[in-house]
A protein has these predicted regions:
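A glycine-centered loop/beta-turn motif at secondary-structure junctions
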Residues: 176-209
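Residue-level signal for short, function-critical loop segments
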Residues: 13-16, 124, 196-197
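Extended, subdomain-level signal for the structured scaffold at the beginning of enzyme domains
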Residues: 1-70, 218
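Cysteine-nucleophile active-site neighborhood
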Residues: 67-140, 144
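Single conserved hydrophobic/aromatic residue that forms the stacking wall/gate
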Residues: 211-223
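Short, flexible loop segments at the rims of nucleotide/cofactor-binding pockets, characterized by
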Residues: 37-41, 70-75, 127, 169-172
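Catalytic beta-strand/loop cores that center a nucleophilic Ser/Cys/Thr
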Residues: 137-187
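Structural motif
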Residues: 59-63, 95, 193
Length: 223
């Protein structure tokens, strides 16, 4: 039986951004909350119903998609840009994977076009000549266990000095293929190229996100 509080998870545009079963990340959050007696309600923000109530959001998830789909989603979210940025700056929890990771930055530049990002993170992405495809193992100082996943991206993402990489690449390519690092942690944002899905493969990363949501959740996750 659940407690008398409920966690609201907002899934941004799963109809457009859902590569490699990214929906599994939502299922993982729901399950790990349920195991601790915490109810979760998932709000799907889709291309058909794009209403977003960020004031009610405890956690936001955005998955991966093609360049074309990223461009569509960015155009749909642009009017919410400042609200999303305020959500992040005020400690809102956000998990972004692959295309969602790129979308949070300043821009994604391909050979033919430049897709303006939401500018929420101090990152930018340039397309490379080849795709970076590999299983990935990361060393993260926050955890005893490595972070694992699968990457498949043409973008090379460069992060600003005020952002911390998610982890050090022990196997695979990472953000640029040669930086030695993968992903970004900024405030309560986790952004990464890793599929898997990410959170079922790395429950410690899921709990790191959930623990920042609210005081009741924090106590349940720690206990």
């Amino acid at each position: 039986m659940g407690n008398n509080y409920e966690i609201n998870i907002v899934h941004l545009y799963p109809d457009l951004l859902n590569l490699y079963g990214d929906r599994g990340n939502i299922a993982c959050m729901e399950k790990r909350l349920k195991w601790r007696g915490i109810d979760a309600k998932v709000h799907m923000c889709t291309n058909q119903d794009g209403s977003i109530d960020l004031k009610a959001a405890d956690i936001i998830f955005v998955g991966g998609g093609s360049d074309r789909e990223q461009e569509i989603v960015c155009s749909l979210l642009i009017e919410k840009k400042e609200e999303l940025k305020a959500y992040v700056e005020n400690g809102g929890v956000l998990v972004a994977v692959c295309g969602g990771y790129q979308l949070l930055g300043k821009y994604y530049k391909t050979a033919n076009t430049k897709i303006e990002g939401l500018g929420i993170l101090d990152i930018y992405t340039d397309a490379g000549d080849t795709r970076l495809i590999s299983n990935v193992v990361l060393e993260c100082e926050k955890f005893d266990q490595p972070i694992v996943g699968f990457e498949n991206h043409a973008g090379r993402t460069y992060i600003g000095e005020n952002h911390t990489p998610l982890g050090k690449v022990k196997f695979g390519n990472g953000n640029t293929g040669d930086s030695g690092y993968e992903g970004v942690i900024y405030k309560n944002v986790i952004a990464t190229y890793l599929h898997g899905p990410l959170l079922p493969k790395n429950p410690q990363l899921c709990d790191l996100s959930l623990i920042h949501i609210s005081e009741p959740t924090r106590h349940s996750l720690i206990s």
